Amino acid sequence: MTQAADTDIRVGQPEMVTLTIDGVEISVPKGTLVIRAAELMGIQIPRFCDHPLLEPVGACRQCLVEVEGQRKPLASCTTVATDDMVVRTQLTSEIADKAQHGVMELLLINHPLDCPMCDKGGECPLQNQAMSNGRTDSRFTEAKRTFAKPINISAQVLLDRERCILCARCTRFSDQIAGDPFIDMQERGALQQVGIYADEPFESYFSGNTVQICPVGALTGTAYRFRARPFDLVSSPSVCEHCASGCAQRTDHRRGKVLRRLAGDDPEVNEEWNCDKGRWAFTYATQPDVITTPLIRDGGDPKGALVPTSWSHAMAVAAQGLAAARGRTGVLVGGRVTWEDAYAYAKFARITLGTNDIDFRARPHSAEEADFLAARIAGRHMAVSYADLESAPVVLLVGFEPEDESPIVFLRLRKAARRHRVPVYTIAPFATGGLHKMSGRLIKTVPGGEPAALDDLATGAVGDLLATPGAVIIVGERLATVPGGLSAAARLADTTGARLAWVPRRAGERGALEAGALPTLLPGGRPLADEVARAQVCAAWHIAELPAAAGRDADGILAAAADETLAALLVGGIEPADFADPDAVLAALDATGFVVSLELRHSTVTERADVVFPVAPTTQKAGAFVNWEGRYRTFEPALRGSTLQAGQSDHRVLDALADDMGVHLGVPTVEAAREELAALGIWDGKHAAGPHIAATGPTQPEAGEAILTGWRMLLDEGRLQDGEPYLAGTARTPVVRLSPDTAAEIGAADGEAVTVSTSRGSITLPCSVTDMPDRVVWLPLNSAGSTVHRQLRVTIGSIVKIGAGS
């Protein structure tokens, strides 16, 4: 009997080899490891060090098999299948079975009997394989080796060295996948052990993966340690809500409380990895300030205290206030909502409030960005995928730092560079640690000079690479703050034929774009200005007409609210601190006659609202996020039942509110929203050209001044990290970055305090002298001691003052 292995064939038919395993012939692609060939036949060879995404090392020797013609058993995880090879596993060979029993006995000699208290107990490969491939008793009578435990690898990862079997999974992940030197094998022989670098700071965003892939309980998570047993938990597949990567994950919970998250196995997206933020930042949904009941102003007094009320009463008050302001109402929806919720906001704005004043971009943005999204991104699903990054002849990044802003994109780019030699270029002020890990190349640029740099790339070596089929240009949301930046990126893509991808920072932004939560776009990427597009939406929504005039963007909505042009605001999940001037946002809310807020937790927005509706976190509702690729990532509620808080999905709240206003919204469930979106489909008409915005060029600062640049670090002061102190403990130290000449100009040395200031505030941090353009200053935008929007009231690209000292 002969079996043929299924193979992902990209180019042509791979060369095959045929071997025999346990008496059965199988044909596999040349280069396949014996252990993989056995897996294709359903034969499970025990192993510890082997992992399909790590390079083979043969460290544990547990996978020994007998190979005909060899003098001794071979490790199947390092042995490559060859033509006519005859392999016998433990199922048919006494030699292989005896060898595996011997290795297991050796591994257990010093392993402690911690199973009753070990976090890995119940899901431990060592425990399971000791039962299936080990002895029933031990012949070892000497004292076991012991170590002091645990050792803090970081604030959130603990190491029990005496449990370690030296499989090197964690160290290989550190070196091969993350590129972070945070854990290594130390000493030799009987003294060999896993340890950390004493002189290297722990700065990995991916350390939690070592806990998950550890085949024993040597590495454990601080937050989960001694909290539960695997067999006590209910596991639910879910999707990460923290960024646009779209990671699959598993949520483990008990009695209505989430206890841990693990990376899900999705080869097309995150493979088997996730970042530490996605793994551990979930306690925000159970903080004491979670809203559990609708709130209204006491006695209807706009200055009265917020008091609890019934859903029906809150609906009646909100409906009355919004109906009175119909046609003079704006909708602000943050980038964290699901695709279905964003669709409900977009539909509610148009048919219930009669306005196109809606925007999901609760952050610095521009009209150029809206044009770019309409022309190049909306309605174009999967134009670039994760797989495309691996096979691209070149990847160009602009306005985007993947390690901080989309960690799984970073891991895939690092894999592309390391395994496939894909060159990665970035247009940025300086080379980051992430760029070095991707073996990337810097195109050093002053903030504001990105359009000129992009235009220059059209000719030359990089332009030639971009003209190669499959080349990719990735732009981040920060490029929206550079006049002409997105226009130049689109122009370069048109000139070279490179594919264009947009990676926002938040999980819900791409879905909100596709749902039509923009002042110039309808669902499916339909241009509002197109009469046919409006007619299609009218037919789907069973209405006579839609408001045709382009609406205001988020900044315009807030400005109109501040001068009382708008009489009411409907706000869902925005953070004023994400805007360039948070004080202006709060002032606009204060000036608005009637504010309805849909929110998970109390905030500066709910403090100013007239009606507050509690909404559910992602663990308690169904929905979908659309990741940066345009891939739909659906999920069901992990937590169900009477123990949950009273929040509802945004779309359910809006559907009920529309009913109270005499309008049938038709989205009471996610299924109803998805059916409507599927019926609408993607716009197949003409997309707008552009954008075509002229670049203004970088501003020229004087002595003692600098152009501000920066981005948000992955681990920062974001509200979705609230309640997770261990994760906050590994956030990177905030610094001010200056060039050597600029630091010398203001009299600051490396490590000394530097103050960055505007007329409205200042930030003082240690100086990190960096190879970057002169009179440019870099700050983390939302880290401890450096919340730029709140403290300076400006955003990147602005001129700020710099000086030595506090």
UniProtKB/Swiss-Prot annotation:
- The reply on keyword Metal-binding is yes
EC class: translocase
PROSITE patterns (alphabetical)? 2FE2S_FER_2 (PS51085), 4FE4S_HC3 (PS51839), 4FE4S_MOW_BIS_MGD (PS51669), COMPLEX1_75K_1 (PS00641), COMPLEX1_75K_2 (PS00642), COMPLEX1_75K_3 (PS00643)
Q: Which reaction does it catalyse?
A: a quinone + NADH + 5 H(+)(in) = a quinol + NAD(+) + 4 H(+)(out)
Enzyme Commission designation: 7.1.1.-
Which cofactors are required for activity? [2Fe-2S] cluster; [4Fe-4S] cluster
InterPro entries documented for this protein: 2Fe-2S_ferredoxin-like_sf, 2Fe-2S_ferredoxin-type, Asp_de-COase-like_dom_sf, MoPterin_dinucl-bd_dom, Mopterin_OxRdtase, Mopterin_OxRdtase_4Fe-4S_dom, NADH_UbQ_OxRdtase_75kDa_su_CS, NADH_UbQ_OxRdtase_ferredoxin
Domain 2Fe-2S ferredoxin-type: residue ranges: 15-93
Record-stated family: Belongs to the complex I 75 kDa subunit family.
What name does UniProt use for this protein? Answer: NADH-quinone oxidoreductase subunit G
Q: Which species does this protein come from?
A: Mycobacterium tuberculosis (strain ATCC 25618 / H37Rv)
